[in-house]
């Protein structure tokens, strides 16, 4: 789950990490009231969407007067915004964050994440903040510093001071940096986060460090014990189909292709998409119906797939270990009848009760195309979509 900037800053402040004073607003008048409550300007007005790159998209404005604040908020609120991080998708701007604006002396970068390669919580820091860290890594990798955290020792003050001196900070600033790192470690672990990125972590004209922007990503598997974080979820920022899928506890991700996929198991689902591409097709989605799939779940999966008008064919690829192939077949038949599927459907079944499942499909009288294996199924659905065009 992702968070808005204002939510991230609330969490940072809760853990003693300094952030500029700010208030969120839903109308231009609320934005003016927020600015007045923060004291004398200047202020920053920032569109709240689940994406970075807002500045280049017109979503971050420097304002010297409250009239400027009102105009900036009016221009952002109620619109939709796309950035280089949204892959062309426009996200609604329902809120703006109004903050105090200080003069930036230096921008740094700091993040903490789970490094699957080293199997540790890892800090990444750079003296080049305010830009994409991938760009820094490609152009000036020597400016990036990392720390793999020992789970027994955790993060200590000397780790932060060492980082701070590598980034060219003064002794006072290195001490502040150390405090931020230690507090960030507590936040990361106590809130079950998968990523915290502060970019920029800035030195302002008062000589102190402040988190000017924050990007958080939580571990969805820990949602059951993070009710306060779940309450922060903004479904308006998410793909509507993915929201419905999450409520049905179906793993679904929208993609750009035209071949819908219904598969059980994440690994098999990824392999299915790969084989479709190898055969010249483009998957329209990732959909893992799960090992505990039943007839109703299959029907709901079909509805999810066909909610996209881009889908021109469906490949069902099931390996019946826990799930029974005959039950999947019953679900497919019911789904085709209930949803009114008008695109080609290719089905590959293997595993428990596979012959019973295949017989049900044959006896259904429906134009369901059988496949012997994953490659055969991918070839058949790609060909069927081409022929139906």
From Swiss-Prot:
It is an enzyme of class 6 (ligase). InterPro entries: ATP-grasp (IPR011761), ATP-grasp_succ-CoA_synth-type (IPR013650), ATP_grasp_subdomain_1 (IPR013815), Succ-CoA_synthase_bsu_CS (IPR017866), SUCC_ACL_C (IPR005811), Succ_CoA_ligase-like_bsu (IPR005809), Succinyl-CoA_synth-like (IPR016102). Gene3D superfamilies: ATP-grasp fold, A domain, ATP-grasp fold, B domain, Succinyl-CoA synthetase domains. Pfam families: ATP-grasp_2, Ligase_CoA. GO terms for molecular function: ATP binding; magnesium ion binding; succinate-CoA ligase (ADP-forming) activity; succinate-CoA ligase (GDP-forming) activity. GO terms for cellular component: succinate-CoA ligase complex. GO terms for biological process: succinyl-CoA metabolic process; tricarboxylic acid cycle. It catalyses: succinate + ATP + CoA = succinyl-CoA + ADP + phosphate; GTP + succinate + CoA = succinyl-CoA + GDP + phosphate. Its cofactor is Mg(2+). Keywords: ATP-binding, Ligase, Magnesium, Metal-binding, Nucleotide-binding, Tricarboxylic acid cycle. Residues 9-244 form the ATP-grasp domain. Belongs to the succinate/malate CoA ligase beta subunit family. NCBIfam families: PRK00696.1, sucCoAbeta. This is Succinate--CoA ligase [ADP-forming] subunit beta. It comes from Stenotrophomonas maltophilia (strain K279a).
